[in-house]
Each structure stands twice: as C-alpha cells, then as structure tokens.
C-alpha cells in the first residue's frame, strides 16, 4: 500500500504551508480575532483565488473533486497556525450537504461560497440533541403550500456572519433540510465565541416564512447528508489537531 502523497497533494501541502508560515503569524491571528467579523475577509477572498474553497466540490459543481486526503492536508497545515477563517462551517459542513444533495438550487449556492462572496452555515444542533443529527424539535408547518419555520438552533458555527443557513427541521413527520435567508423576518441571533475563539451563534426562528423551493432534502436523504458532512468535519478537525500538536511539540 502506497501511503505517500501524490504530486498534486504534495503541491497543495507546500502551497498551504508556505502561506501559513509567511502570512499567518500569531499576532496576525490575534488581530483577526479582535475584528468585528472574527475572520479576515481579504484572506477569505485569497483562499478563493488559490482554489482552496473549491477543493472538495465535485467537478460538475464547479470544484476540483478532491476528497478527504486533500482536506486533511489542508487542515493539518491550518492547525499549525490555528487559522480562524470559517472553512469548516462554510465549505466542509454546509458545502458537503449541498455538494451531495439533489437540490436544484445547489449550483448557485456552491458558486456563491466558492467565489468567497457569501457564507452558509449549517444549523442542526439543538438543546437535547446530544449530537444526534436526526433529532429536531424545530418544525416547519406545511399548510396549503405555505411553510412556517419555528425553533432554536445552538452552536451554529459562523452563524453571525452567514448570509444563508441550512436548517434541519421536522416537516410532515420527517426530517428536512431547508435553506433560509439569515436576514429573514422572525429570525434572531445571539453570537458568542467558542472556547477556541471561533465565532458561533444561537439562532431562533419565530414564524419564519419559507417557500417550497427552500427545501433541500427530505427524510433519509437529510440524515445521510448530515451524517456525511459530520464525518468529513470530524476528519478535518482530527487533521487540524495533528497540526496543532505538531506545532507544539515538534
């Protein structure tokens, strides 16, 4: 079994490593964390220009079609300097859901995040969910084609900066995922930092009106999409942790 990086993977690693060493000092990171956004918008645009935001998306969705190994390479280098830009929330979690979905509007949404123009956050955790992606007290009432969203989501990574949210909810006795404008009437946010200074939010929905085109997936597809996104995110966080430990002890 060949466990060596391919030439492309090694080139990616060298590129990310060079950026992190030359452009992402600890002082730079501290300045970013003190900003209103909690990330550097110019660096995020640079990530797009370098192609990093397109790495994991399928070629038919405008990406490079790379997989978990390339994401591990990226996150291990990110971990060495504790990069705070919202790659995990926008590209890995929300991006994975969109990339693997059969949603008709996925192409435009993916283009909006790979271009660096917008952020989308995944809102699936709730009080009492215990990390079970199939759990949802949040509901979407379906009355004669009119959809009304109610509920509260916790630990929404980068939720304060997102222009759209992917929200899990129960509708007609099955789990659905819906795309929701972050400035929708009836939506409110409480933002706060996580223990590692990442931006997070608790988001409440009170009679938020949606149309049928907002539904990304239903039933087992929703659960499969969430599980896949969480699995990839877990891998990325593990690689990031290796990078952290490497920087500390080697």
What are the roles of these predicted feature ranges?
Residues 4-12, 79-80, 93, 187-250:
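Glycine-rich beta->alpha junctions and the first turn(s) of the following alpha-helix
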Residues 9, 20, 74, 151, ...:
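Residue-level signal for inorganic ion chemistry
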Residues 27-49:
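Short secondary-structure junction/hinge motifs that connect adjacent elements
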Residues 48-107, 111-116, 158-161:
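Internal helix-loop-helix
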Residues 87, 128-131, 155-158, 192-196:
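Short Gly/Pro-enriched turn/cap motifs at secondary-structure boundaries
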Residues 116-127:
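A short, Trp-centered hydrophobic/proline-enriched beta-strand micro-motif
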Residues 138-141:
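A structural signal for short hydrophobic beta-strand segments in well-ordered beta-sheet cores
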Residues 150-187:
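A short core secondary-structure module
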